[in-house]
């Protein structure tokens, strides 16, 4: 039996990277011999954080659209073409069984290419307000995993699976007490703390 091969793509911020790592960790826990490859944007946070988590990563030469600055977007069409060619080479070389996108620049060309080649694609949307990349990819996605109800306003209802947000096991299994956490973050236990 062949090993399960999964490409996970996206990043740019911890809000994309850490759920992606949680997905990879869960896959490895359930299918220990799974071969997982991350694809991110060159020069972005994922190129450092993913290898620290123990996974391989390849980078695409991609950047997002800079709102309000035409000058900063002059090279964007070339970067898009370069990233699509790079994604094509990665997908053809790795031959994944499935491609997972978590949002961010790199997931766009990677999932678009995987879908075009015939690889099933999964989008994971962590937010109640869907990101631009995931909105653009939704039409061709096989499955769209969401963290919140009501996402059929943005995504095709028949593709949505309510999964909640992927959380890394070291957070779920933490034995830290409330008191230890308050002390660690320098917060006063007698005051109400709201995280925004």
Model regions: which residues?
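Conserved nucleotide-sugar phosphate-binding/catalytic loop shared by glycosyltransferases and other
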Residues: 3-11, 29-78, 165-167, 184
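Short amphipathic alpha-helix
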Residues: 16-27
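Glycine-rich phosphate-binding loop signature in dinucleotide/nucleotide-binding domains
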Residues: 31, 90-95, 185-189
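An amphipathic, basic-hydrophobic alpha-helix
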Residues: 65-98
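Active-site-proximal region of nucleotide-activated glycan assembly enzymes
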Residues: 115-178, 187
């Amino acid at each position: 039996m062949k090993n399960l091969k999964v490409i996970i793509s996206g990043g740019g911020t911890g809000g994309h990277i850490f759920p992606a790592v949680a997905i990879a960790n869960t896959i490895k826990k359930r299918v220990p011999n799974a071969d997982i490859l991350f694809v991110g944007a060159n020069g972005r946070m994922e190129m450092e954080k993913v290898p620290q988590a123990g996974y391989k990563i390849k980078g695409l030469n991609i950047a997002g659209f800079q709102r309000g600055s035409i000058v900063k977007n002059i090279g964007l069409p070339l970067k898009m073409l370069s990233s699509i060619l790079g994604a094509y080479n990665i997908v053809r070389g790795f031959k994944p069984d499935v491609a997972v996108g978590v949002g961010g620049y790199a997931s766009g060309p990677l999932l678009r290419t995987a879908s075009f080649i015939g690889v099933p694609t999964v989008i994971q949307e962590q937010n109640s307000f869907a990101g631009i990349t995931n909105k653009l990819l939704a039409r061709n996605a096989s499955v769209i995993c969401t963290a919140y109800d009501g996402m059929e306003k943005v995504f095709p209802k028949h593709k949505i699976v309510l999964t909640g947000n992927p959380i890394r096991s070291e957070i779920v299994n933490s034995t830290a007490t409330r008191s230890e956490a308050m002390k660690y973050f320098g917060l006063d236990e007698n005051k109400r703390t709201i995280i925004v």
